[in-house]
Amino acid sequence: MYSLETIGQNKRHNPADLSSPPTVLLLLLSLFMAIVSGKSTASDTDQLASTMPKLVVQITVDQLRGDLPMRFRERLGEGGFRYLLEQGTHFNNAHYRHANTETAVGHATLVTGADPSRHGIVANEWFDPQTGESTYNTEDDRHHLIGEKAKTHQGVSPRNLLSSTIGDELVLSNAAKSRVFSVSGKDRGAILPGGHAGKAFWYSKSSGQFVTSTYYYDEYPKWVADWNAGKPTERYRGQQWKLLQPRETYFARDLDDREYEADFGALGRTFPHGYGDDKYTNLVVGLTPAIDELTLEFAKLVLEKEKLGAGAVTDFLAVSFSATDYVGHLFGPASLETEDNILRLDRILASFFSFLDETVGLENTLIVLSADHGAPEAPEYMQSIGLDTGRFDFDHFKQPNPLSAALLERFGRNDLILAHSHPYLHLNYIAIREAGLEPSVVERFVAAEAIKLPGIAYAMSRSELVDGQYADAPIQRQIRRNFHFDRSGSVHLVQEQYWFLHSTDEAAKMGLAGLAAIHGSPWVYDTYVPIFFAGHTVPAQKIDRRVSPTDIAPTISDYLGIKYPSGNSGNPLSEVTRARTITQ
């Protein structure tokens, strides 16, 4: 096997002297006979299979904005991000093309190559005005968690994902010989990347175990049951998340206690952060770097017990690390907590790559790493350096407000806004019909009035999107790519740069007064993510041209010689696929 120091240099020792005349003649004769016969033999097929990676590992780091690996580069260890930066292909200018940069949306895009308008995951949840209920992105009442009773809105599966995924296409390409698994600290971070044909496991903040639903299994495999029986979170009970390095070595050493940071139970706002020793311990573990440690441990177990990468065809493993997102939400990207988390994530990646090298071989593994979205700094932090920012609370619409007053004045009713769910306002179409109003007129009026609210930059109605009556400008195109006729809301809101659209009610459900930072906009800080390809035959190079995460799925597909996912709208990255063609 190749070491971490040599993988990516693409050097292969060949004892044959290909420059000698007899060798050249033999090669030409063999090529001529192959062309004349027009047939492939079993050995040809075996040889082709041997050039394919044995394993594809697609890593998603939740909320890893594109600049973060470079920001802390001088502090990184060996074998983690440094391996990707120095021995992989790094696309340094990658941006999502859709407007709602939320977790579920990004994860779906990464594995389908599709925009939300095609894969259908337009938000973390969407509202159905006919039923008056919200639908979670992976909700499926038919499939409850194994070992639990079926409950409304509690079952999960990939049913809502409308496009096939890379893993699905891999399984379809070889009569289901490939195996596909997905692991994450979040359900959506596992279920969506696992696709329809894979198996998904995710961390439960209530039980402290890795769980799955009856969509995947009737009962837990023994190795999963055994691992959960070991009570993996007990090691953190009563312990603390302490700084990995001396405080004076951190860039953000003075950014540890700010009033806008979330303050939750034993976790607190300052180092050392406690995990607690009560009923909330499993929850706190799931919000800190500890969840990435558990995710890595479980992912290694999947590789070992399912023998991924050991068969005759390519297997696929998706791993989504969630801690960066939770830490960013609680403390903000410009915080001591985020810096320490990145250093810990770097160690996690180094451990993972080393394990892959020992078990499958990095020369046999295609590694892909990206993120589901970026993130802004906290508004209060941006205000401290002179930017005009603020927070716009969606719950504002539950109270008398300028928008409801404008509706009352224009249409004689103030009950025309039914609900909100980021980034949408949902209108009360029953009330609109009762009043004899034209829905498109009300939609466009609400959009026009919403722009007058402080912190709102753009608002587009669904009627504008359906009719195609909008300016062909970047923000409008991003909103259009996010629009799905059956799932998108009545009006799509876009906040001013560095303003937040949020809901204090949603934060309250987590026992928090609020969150430090919230993503979900079409602005660059939210769309900007890294894209790395490494291992196998991938060369070391840095690419500065603008690309999109929609390009990842078709690149992997081309690399493996399989068809693109059904909803794909991206293009293969030639810097990666060309190197693969040359080595073949």
Regions found by a protein language model. Name each.
Residues 191-199, 273-283, 287, 310-345, ...:
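Active-site His/acidic residue clusters
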Residues 43-89:
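Active-site-proximal N-terminal segment of extracellular/periplasmic enzymes that hydrolyze or transfer
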Residues 56, 171-172, 177-184, 190-193, ...:
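Active-site regions of oxyanion-processing enzymes, predominantly non-cytosolic
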Residues 384, 388, 392-437, 514-560, ...:
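Substrate-binding rim/cap in mid-to-C-terminal beta-strand-loop elements of soluble/periplasmic
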Residues 76, 93, 102, 124-155, ...:
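Secreted, luminal/periplasmic, and some membrane-associated catalytic domains
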Residues 236-296, 300-301:
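Long, low-complexity, polar/charged, intrinsically disordered or flexibly structured peripheral segments
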Residues 69-118, 179-183:
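Short, structured active-site-proximal loop/turn typified by the sulfatase FGly-forming signature C/S-X-P-X-R
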Residues 24-35:
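Bacterial N-terminal signal peptides
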